[in-house]
Every structure is written in structure tokens, then in C-alpha cells.
Amino acid sequence: LPYDIDFRVGRWLQDFEGDMGLYWGYDANPIFGSYRMDGFRAHKAWGNFNGTAIVARNSKTWDYSTWDGAKWVPALGTDSDEYMHYVLDMNFRPNEKFWVGATAYWWQGDFGAADASDANVNTYGIYAGFAFNPNVELKGIYYFQNIGNDLANGFDDSPKAWKAVLDVKQDLLKFTSLWLQYEQVDNSFYGLNQQNNMDWGQAISVTDNRPMNDNSTKVWMLGAEQVWNDKWTTFLKYAQADYDTAGLDDAKNWTVGVTYQYTPAVAFQLVYDNIDFGDNNPLGFSSGDDHLIKFRTSVSF
């Protein structure tokens, strides 16, 4: 298009947090975003600035439910095709050390339950990073929301979520990289993705038991990767979530894995993943521990 604008029409997955390196490479999700949408996207880069604007439909939505003691009761039953979806993202990188940006998502209900109810969702994010040197970077993101009263279901309709990350490369420590992360999410925050779960499709997460109330969930996470040579890589992760809710135990998850790069196009990976939700959680929430062993073959074309 004119003025060097990149324009896209169709279906795509948008992930601004991933673009800025705001979650660990083996993790599946950002706090918010990273979902399919159908529509129009325009992107413009000029100098050290980048801007993206989106108009779309059919974006992912979440239907909050509350536990009535016997079953989960949906708040509204809204669907993804009941919302118009508008997004604006701007970021600025003046030099190799510092970057800053902001994102806004506006979900406006215009059909069905989303139109008939007060169910709009406005989500705003501010993110930044500072590299002390090429191997150490401090970065993070802060979200705040305004959600419709009907969708909030009687709980806080202006929730917050944020995380801070210290990213240390293996070039500094020699034997491993380190990803140290602290995250805090209000329990009424709308649209939280599963946090710190492995990037392999359907997976369990320490935030799966997050309740809907006016408290906040705190998540600590440590990730480490060891690149031994061109063939062998190992990694490990530990994450723990405190839901700040009486009767709900903390969730703890740890993972170890090894990857063998057989050829430039073929890799084999073996992973052990363990999660413990505690033993005394209320009916309707996960309890006990579980684990899996996963063998994965990746072929690149």
C-alpha cells in the first residue's frame, strides 16, 4: 500500500507479547492476547516506531462462570461472533537498550447476548524493557481493564494484571540461561490465558484453579535452558501459583526436558511434566497431582 503500509486481510494469530519477547520461549501463552481473529490489519514502521491497527471479528472470548456449590454457572453465554474487535499497538525502540510500547483492545458487543447486556471489554497494556548489557534484560507488562457489569458478574469490573521478568542469557552464565518471572493477576481479570504451561497444544497450567473473586493470584516462575552444543539442549521450569483464596491450595508445576537436533530439519524431544494442585480444594476445582511423559518429533520443511 502507499506509505509502505503492510496490509493484511483474512485470518491470523496476533501476539504482541510474543513479538516483544515477554514470555519464556517454552511457554505457550502471554497474559492476554495471542488468539485467532478474522478481519483487517494495517502495520506501519517508520524509524524506531512501529504501529499496528486491527479491525476484526470472531476473536476468542471467555465466558466467566461461578461455582454455586453444585455446578459452574455461566455469566452470560456470549460467543466470539457477537463482538466487533478493535486493536491499536504502538511501540518505540530508540536504541539497543530500551524499548517501550502500549496496546489497546476494544471488544464491543453488537449481537446476541453481548449486545443485549453490558458485556463490553476494554483492555489496555503498557510494556517496556531495558537491557543492562547484551546478556541481561529487565522487562515487563502492565494491563488494566474495564469490563461490563453484566460480564463482571458482581465482581471487580476494573481488574489489573502485570508481570516483571529478568532475562539472563547463557552467554553470561556460561552453563545456563535464566528466566525469572513474577506475575500478579486480579481474579476477575477477563481473558487470562493459561500461564506457564508448555507450548504443545492442550496442557495443564498452575492458573487452572484461578477462581472468580476480588482477590489476586500470584505466580512465581523460573525457567532455564542449557545449550550444550549444536545437537543437545536441556531445559527445566518451576512455577507456583497462590490464588489468595481460602480453601484453595497453591498449585506447583515443574518440568524437565531434553531436545536432540538430529538434522537441521528433524528434532526429537523428551519431556517430563508434573503438577500438584494440593489435596483439599473445593468441589469443582482440580485437586491432587498429575504428570505426563511426552515424546515429540519435529520436522521442518
Features from the language model and the residues they span:
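Hydrophobic, well-ordered secondary-structure elements that form the walls
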Residues: 180, 224, 258, 269-270, ...
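Outer-membrane beta-barrel "beta-signal"
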Residues: 260-266, 287-301
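C-terminal structured domain segments
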Residues: 251-274
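Sequence/structural signature of outer-membrane beta-barrel proteins
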Residues: 12-29, 56-80, 105-115, 143-154, ...
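Secondary-structure boundary/capping motif
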Residues: 11, 52, 104-106, 137, ...
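Outer membrane beta-barrel
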Residues: 1-69, 80-99, 129, 139, ...
